């Protein structure tokens, strides 16, 4: 394996790990928001104080949300059975530390117990006497839950207490030393590299929940989610940009600022690497502003949209929220404008920067790809890469795996029994949802009413999936998750000629 291929493999594994972390948190964002509303509205200093309803906030953050996260983590590993036992075992960690929201503990216990349940079943089921299946299944799950609950109480809880203490001390040290803005030096570049979800949902959300439970709000929820720095970059392109970058920056600004999809501005930074300075300084400004005003959110601001910021702003602190976003955008804009005004034009264009970003992320970005496709209606197919070596294993070589499944030849498959199409992406909430919505509209216009179109995360693809549509960089993972399904690869979810090819094939099979 060449060094380049090895780096790509490592990148895929890192991206998969980051996706797994965010897949535990993102499906439960609704619960976070519900808890945030209850805390923001009904507590003593809320919008409508109510002592009775305020009592809901504590149990929700202490029990409900950690259990949901543990269930999600266990289910990702071993479906419903893994999720149930994972949630059961996580009670040990929660009860051991009732004053600390055990989100980090749940993120560890959930996948671990799900994996142990899977291995336990693999060991016991082949040795189970006929007629005793239910007995063995129930007792094996119960015994594992019993053991892991005690392990969580006696082993993981003290470990979590130590880890949370170290992390809390580090964050508090930065706060007291007025150095918290320096975190942006790492956070802003890491977002653009591919770690935005892993950072926000894997680090700041658990720590922020602990702070919010103790202090009522947390500044940590604002560090990665502030839409100001990205808006400043896009505003600079609107005024000082040229060509495709300028033309697409207006739509990108709306998607980023109001929709909260931050990845839309990543290619604009990659086009001019000096713009990393702009987003870092913008991020530092936002954090410094919120630190100076004592601002924070009661729950995660996800997605990082200005609308979400407005809805989550605590009573009496709306102006503080506006100030943090405005100053972050202003500093980012001024620095970006100076860079664009007084430096040479970049050698690479928006298309190349988008490709660079996608290569770095280890996957296609349908939102970023729309930047390129919206400026021109020509959609060119990728040229076939070189012949795959006969000695390559399709499991190790994604290109060979895609060739074996004919993922780019829509006409090569039989669609007679298809009644469900699934769009799958990393987290199952953003780009795949847009792709599914687009195909549903196409089906509706074509009179195809007997086929359901849904979206999900790759890790949550059902084993009985019939037809799965993914972006090319993710198709190999989807195939390994559902090897018996038909798989179609697209360059981006928002503009692919394969949708029309699929429609034509479905119509033919329906008429036949």
Swiss-Prot record:
Ranges where the PTS EIIB type-2 domain occurs: 419-512
SS bonds (residue pairs): none
Positions of region (Disordered): 355-402
InterPro entries reported for this sequence: PTS_EIIB-like_sf, PTS_EIIB_2, PTS_EIIB_2/3, PTS_EIIB_mannitol, PTS_EIIC, PTS_EIIC_2, PTS_IIC_mtl, Sugar_PTS
GO BP annotation list: phosphoenolpyruvate-dependent sugar phosphotransferase system
Biased composition (Low complexity): 365-376
GO molecular function: kinase activity; protein-N(PI)-phosphohistidine-mannitol phosphotransferase system transmembrane transporter activity; protein-phosphocysteine-sugar phosphotransferase activity
Keywords annotated in UniProt: Cell membrane, Kinase, Membrane, Phosphoprotein, Phosphotransferase system, Sugar transport, Transferase, Transmembrane, Transmembrane helix, Transport
Ranges where the PTS EIIC type-2 domain occurs: 17-349
Pfam families (alphabetical): PTS_EIIC (PF02378), PTS_IIB (PF02302)
Membrane topology, as annotated: Multi-pass membrane protein
TM annotation in the entry: 29-50, 55-75, 140-161, 171-191, 279-298, 319-340
Modified residues (Phosphocysteine): 425
First-level EC class: transferase
Chain ranges on the Cytoplasmic side, renumbered to this chain: 1-28, 76-139, 192-278, 341-512
Regions of compositional bias (Polar residues) in chain numbering: 380-392
Catalytic activity: D-mannitol(out) + N(pros)-phospho-L-histidyl-[protein] = D-mannitol 1-phosphate(in) + L-histidyl-[protein]
Active site residues of this protein: 425
EC number(s) on file: 2.7.1.197
GO CC field: plasma membrane
Subcellular location(s) per record: Cell membrane
Entry text on domains: The EIIC type-2 domain forms the PTS system translocation channel and contains the specific substrate-binding site.
Assembly, per entry: Homodimer.
Role description: The phosphoenolpyruvate-dependent sugar phosphotransferase system (sugar PTS), a major carbohydrate active transport system, catalyzes the phosphorylation of incoming sugar substrates concomitantly with their translocation across the cell membrane. The enzyme II CmtAB PTS system is involved in D-mannitol transport.
Protein's name in the database: PTS system mannitol-specific EIICB component
Source taxonomy: Bacteria, Bacillati, Bacillota, Bacilli, Bacillales
UniProt gene name: mtlA
